[in-house]
A protein has these predicted regions:
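Short alpha-helical segments and helix-capping/turn motifs at coil-helix boundaries
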Residues: 45-50, 86-88, 94-98
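Amphipathic alpha-helical interaction segments
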Residues: 36-38, 75, 89, 93, ...
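N-terminal targeting and processing segments
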Residues: 65-66, 87-90, 122
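Extended charged/polar low-complexity repeat regions
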Residues: 5-9, 14, 29, 81-83, ...
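Generic recognition of flexible, low-complexity loop/linker segments
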Residues: 49-51, 90, 304, 316
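Short, polar loop/linker segments at the starts of domains and inter-domain junctions
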Residues: 72-86
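Intrinsically disordered, low-complexity segments enriched in small residues
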Residues: 1-75
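Solvent-exposed loop and beta-edge segments used for protein-protein assembly and interaction
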Residues: 55-57, 94-96, 156-158
Length: 340
């Protein structure tokens, strides 16, 4: 992880932290590349980070993408850019009885030993700390003592939160859980999920960036809003596979170039499973700036960035705020998510 939320690009290609064998479980897409580019260790096609949105300011919201065709054996669910793609917010910590598995935003699975409340572990190969909440202060002289002290008390003291950083200067990546509306059949209080997701960032000056996740419905758990360190508010427009299929069929019916309407088989309402992890079919369609304290009356009338997808849910094209196509991608029809 970089200071601004990019993928991990330093350290080993893959590692089990705390394990005596140091068995690599996947590779870092931002690491060694050559050719098209292809990672020479596994022959996986990779694309280094591409930034679609970055406004200046303290602890800004930076939206970027990285791609790797490599499939880890312990994948996180497919993210909002489709199979193979990762966004800075695509960080997930799996809580297991015998291990903590961090699915980073570079497509890797990094294994740690379980942590007790307040315990911290440092990975020399990744130059990264992973800390479990539950302690008011770190010992005097500890590398993270000042950075830990800058966190709000409710974060520091919660044993249910995990935090990661790659620098004593910060920022912290806060790994929590998304609130949800309980169902009528749920037993209350509902147990916490066996994983943690990125809920925000905090820097050494006490500034925060917050991800707002949906609490109910088809988009439950997904990020639909962001407030950055400058107080700007962004709305993330998400679509389901069924919504995109209906839009495609409606567009086909109204198009003068179409001799017959688009069939359900050509653009299905649901997506089949892939080797890239479970896929709910939810994709990021556009990002809007909804509030800017510095320019409250000068908000843009168009999205800052827009995305389109194939019938298989693969990222097809990227458009900037002038609606100009700035990137396009093609994929292997026989292997969903594999870029060509």
């Amino acid at each position: 992880m970089t200071q601004y939320g990019g993928p991990i690009v330093q350290g080993s290609a893959g590692v089990r932290i705390g394990a005596p064998t140091g068995v690599a479980c996947s590779v870092c897409p931002g690491g060694m590349t050559s050719g098209n580019p292809v990672n020479p260790l596994l022959g996986a096609k990779v694309l280094p980070g591409e930034t679609d949105l970055a406004l200046p300011g303290p602890l800004p919201f930076i939206l970027s993408r990285t791609y790797s065709s490599y499939r880890t054996r312990t994948p996180a669910p497919v993210g909002v850019f489709g199979p193979g793609w990762k966004a800075p917010s695509d960080i997930r910590l799996q809580l297991r009885d015998d291990a903590l598995v961090l699915n980073d935003n570079g497509g890797r699975s990094i294994h740690f030993e379980p942590l007790l409340p307040g315990e911290a572990v440092y990975s020399r190969s990744e130059s990264m700390w992973l800390v479990r909440g539950g302690k008011a202060a770190q010992p005097d002289g500890h590398t993270l003592a000042r950075l830990w002290g800058a966190l709000p008390p409710d974060i520091r003291l919660s044993p249910h939160l995990y935090l990661a950083t790659n620098s004593a200067q910060g920022p912290w990546w806060i790994l929590g859980w998304s609130e949800r509306v309980p169902g009528a059949e749920d037993v209350l209080p509902a147990p916490l999920p066996p994983y943690r997701v990125l809920t925000g960032l905090a820097d050494r000056f006490g500034r925060t960036l917050t991800y707002r996740r949906e609490a109910a419905g088809d988009l439950a758990g997904e990020i639909t809003g962001v407030t950055d360190g400058a107080g700007r508010e962004f709305r993330l427009v998400l679509t389901t596979q069924a919504q995109r299929a209906e839009e495609a069929r409606t567009s086909s019916l109204s198009s003068s170039d179409s001799s017959r309407p688009l069939s359900a088989s050509a653009f299905p309402d649901t997506l089949p499973g892939t080797e890239y992890g479970p896929d709910r079919g939810i994709r990021l369609s556009a990002v809007w700036l909804m509030h800017d304290p510095a320019y409250p009356e000068s908000l843009p009338a168009a999205p800052l960035v827009r995305y389109t997808y194939t019938e298989a849910g693969e990222l097809l094209a990227v458009y900037d705020r002038s609606n100009t196509q700035v990137r396009a991608f093609t994929y292997d029809a026989q292997h969903p998510g594999r870029m060509v």
